[in-house]
Amino acid sequence: LSRRQRQMCIRDRGGTTGASNAGREPYCEYYASQVAETMGLNAVHYDLENWKGITASKCELFTNIDTAYIPIGRIVRTGGIAACLAWYEKLGTEFSEQLCSMLVFDALIYNEDRHFGNFGVLRDNHSGKIIAPAPVFDNGLSLFCYAGKEDYAHLDEYAKTRSNPYNISYEEVCAEVMGARQKEQLRRMIGFRFKRHESLNLPEEHLQAIEK
């Protein structure tokens, strides 16, 4: 492998298999990445590829020999998302703002899988110091990933059946963390449309339903 290839994506993920609506996670990862980028978040960029006949999402690593990812669940062990917010606030405004932005983003895309291993911080492997919030990553279980054709016309009702890992509604999370930065990030979504992949896409009716 070339040096560039070694630096490039070493994180390929396929989707689930089985039911007619299975296997959609890589697609939703790709589309959710577009939302994060439009909002201007510190987020991992995802693309799609066909790998040995399997549709997979791919991205570049955000860690290296000098930098480690530490999941928040290894640091804040009790108290849920409220305790995580308080811990981030102690690290400073930028840490706190990025966490709040991630939570608003998750609510916007109905991310159902932002558990305490799916966000965290970056640590300098030499000094042991926390140096930055980790970028937003792993957003595949979102955008009504498992919605069926019968749900597309009634997404408002379907949305009520979706939940995050915190036992708090998406609306309650947003009410707690929404600030000026997050409002500006949401304004950037006005008129947003998903960029279709040249060959790998969710059904068009799914995309049109979630674009409304």
Language-model regions: role of each:
Residues H126-K212:
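C-terminal catalytic region of ATP-dependent kinase domains
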Residues A19-H45:
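A conserved alpha-helical element in kinase catalytic cores
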Residues T16-A19, N118:
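A short, flexible beta-alpha/helix-coil linker loop
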Residues A83-G148:
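Conserved kinase catalytic-core segment
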Residues D47-L91:
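Conserved structural core of kinase catalytic domains
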Residues L1-I10, D47:
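Single conserved hydrophobic/aromatic residue that forms the stacking wall/gate
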